Amino acid sequence: MWTNLLKKHRSKLDMSSVDLDGSHTRATKGGESIGYQGRKKSKTTNALYLTDRQGLPLTMSVPVSGEHNDLYRIKRSTDEIFGTLEEAVIPVDGLFLNADAGFDSEDFRNQCLSHGVFPNVCFNKRNGGYDRNELLIDELYRKRYIIERTNAWMDSFRSVLVIHDTTLTSWEAWNYIVFAVLLLRNIKHSLVKITSIKRTTKNTELTEKQFIPYFP
């Protein structure tokens, strides 16, 4: 369902660049791909999320248990993410992708490049200094805050704020339902804005016609 919806409305997306981020979600019960995450001091699942420049969620990786970091099985995760875009007839070749320092690894960069994607990854201090040959466009990276806003949007939906399901497919389905709601909400807002502009333009034209001076 989600891939078809994404394909149908792909013209509404802003693919000038995309953002990638990992997100841990707490689980109230046990279940598939659930594990203890020390930083959150609770059981979580971890998934990677990709958004467009507007912050609209595009796809996610198959979640893994919470004890794993964002680079766990990164080849599989990137193949899943870029594969979904390709299924939706959204070209990935030439995309610029922002990611935080947690993705600063040779494997991740190589995986992106193998799909034709340019990784704009913040340098991790533990991997050395900033005088490196890898790509990092600061001006582009500063736009990454938008995916943090998307995380806040997602958290406003109780169905994905905390995991109550025990099956992985159910949890993924809830995420894609939220993706669809956010996309359709954005489309509706855009249509309302366009209609408002057209009405304003039409009213302005009528007003101008009413006040056109007549010179006999």
Residue ranges and their predicted role:
Residues M1-P216:
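Short alpha-helical elements
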